[in-house]
């Protein structure tokens, strides 16, 4: 009867612990539908796309050779990427330890003594015992600890990939910022040169008395020239600061950056965002959030396993030249084996508290995972909308620049014919300058939208 009761208790414990062995599965209530909005339909999820812009290797997105060289250098030398790689190594150590927990632990404890009685001949005894202990993972504690360590390692790898994506995006952003500032500097310097010549012309016209040129007109010309000249130091300072920021990203002292020109840049313009489920496998932060949830799931299983018995097998073997009262040589082999079972009965509520904490942490991780998904979809929606808006602005701005240029040319011709004032010439010239600078800014914003979309879709692959 006693044997039957023990058998029944063991069977009950085994059946109730079966779910502890289950691997993590994504919860069914995690929402992946409607993560981001179609910029055409305005409200529905893009489900028809099969190609995914985020799957493109970064070299196919950023084709400027100088930018590619900078990105390669950043991925090799950046302090951030080196720290991320070290974190992966740190996470590999607990995983190795959790795997070795399945192997018996061995301990060697050599001992030796020298003794003498009544000034007699000294006798020497020694023993070389080797002790082994092995925990039988009957209720899944070691298995879940190993799975938790594996999930933590995958989470750290996702963090490393996320660092790569951010480095690529930040390097591209800073590089294109330099190209934008270079173009703005070029436009502003060209305008300043035109205004300088206009001022010299106005001064000569006043001296010659042509078209009744007044001192006020000359001063207006000088003021316009000085205003444009005053903006040049700010642009040059911005260029220097962006170069320094890019050098810092590369882990180098500040220096000038070799680069191309804005007009030569070609970025993708036809995007397939992919179905929302692809965000789960593409975005590193989504991967990391799900691995954090998996880690919390296994931690809950570990907390559950604390309620079940622990069975440990231990044994020892060794050699000794001591056998009771007699001192003998050569050494003899000694061996023993023990099996023990530890069943928690009363732990002052510690195990219950640990389980409650683990369950709460698992729920927190699930909420964080869902929030990360929503944030990913929001970033994709914003990047798509930003690109569409910037494309429309660039198209309209091109028309503005053409019209402003024509207006400036016509006004200058009318002034030369004496049918327009110099104030009108200045106004037209300033409008043209403003339109050109805005066009450059809008072009850069569109490039930023491409980078943001690529990053939001988890881009950054090597191949």
Region locations from a protein language model:
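Acidic, low-complexity, intrinsically disordered peripheral segments
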Residues: 7, 19-23, 267, 437-463
């Amino acid at each position: 009867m006693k044997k039957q009761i023990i058998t029944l208790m063991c069977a009950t414990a085994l059946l109730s612990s079966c779910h502890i062995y289950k691997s993590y599965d994504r919860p069914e209530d995690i929402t992946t539908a409607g993560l981001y909005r179609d910029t055409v339909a305005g409200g529905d999820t893009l489900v028809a796309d099969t190609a995914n812009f985020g799957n493109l290797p970064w070299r196919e997105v950023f084709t400027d050779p100088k930018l590619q060289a900078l990105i390669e250098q950043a991925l090799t030398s950046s302090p951030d990427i080196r720290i991320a790689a070290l974190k992966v190594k740190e996470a590999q150590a607990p995983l190795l330890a959790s795997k070795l927990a399945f192997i018996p632990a061995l301990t060697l404890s050599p001992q030796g003594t020298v003794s003498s009685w009544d000034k007699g001949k000294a006798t020497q005894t020694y023993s070389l015992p080797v002790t082994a202990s092995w925990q039988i993972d009957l209720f899944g504690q070691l298995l879940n600890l190993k799975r938790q360590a594996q999930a933590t390692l995958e989470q750290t790898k996702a963090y490393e990939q996320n660092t790569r994506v951010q480095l690529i995006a930040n390097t591209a952003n800073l590089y294109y910022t330099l190209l934008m500032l270079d173009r703005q500097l070029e436009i502003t310097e060209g305008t300043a040169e035109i205004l300088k010549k206009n001022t010299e012309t106005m001064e000569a016209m006043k001296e010659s008395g042509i078209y009744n040129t007044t001192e006020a007109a000359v001063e207006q010309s000088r003021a316009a020239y000085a205003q444009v000249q005053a903006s040049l130091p700010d642009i040059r300072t911005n260029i220097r600061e962006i170069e320094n920021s890019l050098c810092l990203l590369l882990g180098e002292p500040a220096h000038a950056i070799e680069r191309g020109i804005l007009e030569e840049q070609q970025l993708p313009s036809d995007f397939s965002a992919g179905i929302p489920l692809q965000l789960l496998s593409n975005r590193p932060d989504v991967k990391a959030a799900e691995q954090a949830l998996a880690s919390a799931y296994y931690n809950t299983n570990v907390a559950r396993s604390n309620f079940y018995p622990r069975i440990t097998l231990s044994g020892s073997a060794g050699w000794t030249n001591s056998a009771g009262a007699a001192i003998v040589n050569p050494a003899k082999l000694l061996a023993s084996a023990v099996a023990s079972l530890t069943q928690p009965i009363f732990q002052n509520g510690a195990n219950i508290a640990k389980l409650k904490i683990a369950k709460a942490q698992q729920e927190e991780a699930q909420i964080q995972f869902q929030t990360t998904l929503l944030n990913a979809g929001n970033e994709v929606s914003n990047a798509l909308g930003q690109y569409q808006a910037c494309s429309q602005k660039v198209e309209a701005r091109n028309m503005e620049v053409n019209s402003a240029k024509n207006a400036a040319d016509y006004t200058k011709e009318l002034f030369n014919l004496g049918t327009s004032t110099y104030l009108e010439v200045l106004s037209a010239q300033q409008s043209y300058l403003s339109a050109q600078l805005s066009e450059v800014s809008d072009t850069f914003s569109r490039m930023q939208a491409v980078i943001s979309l690529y990053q939001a879709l988890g881009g950054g692959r090597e191949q």
